[in-house]
Amino acid sequence: MKDYKLKRQKNLDKYRRQYEERKEFHKLLKEYASDIIASENFRNTRNYIQHGSMPVYRHCMDVADQSIKISKLLRVNCNERELIRGALLHDYFLYDWHDKYRDNYQRLHGFYHPGIALRNAQKEYSLSDREKDIIKKRMWPLTIIPPACREAWIVTAADKYCSLLETLKLRRGSGKTRMEIAK
């Protein structure tokens, strides 16, 4: 009976911590990125699949969340605003990269989409140099030139972590395939 109560208390503590972390993350989103979250183009990223069945929207939110967790875990002194905004916009390419029939289809999406995401983000937002660095270089080593700031290194690590979980289907998206979303 004692073991059961102890286990139950540990689970409750874990869920409380997770709830507090989510609450803090949403507070940071509201404070630093409400314009991005409210934008129609960013909301439309729900219609594009990133890895497996994960929508780009959720992938970017997860990368932003993991970036904050990594920076706190490692006690890295960085600019949270730029970290969150760069993480949210890191895959702002605004097309279905799986669609072989779209205009300008490029098989080397991994090499080209950071530049496309940066161009799209610059059209809609006033970006700092760090935010630009995050968006453009977080695909390193594919992008050849490594990130120049802590924030970009953190988003690079968070993106690779989230992408791995999504690709191995350890973190699932909406469960919908690209074809179901297109309907």
Label each residue range with its predicted role.
Residues 1-183:
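Metal-dependent phosphohydrolase cores
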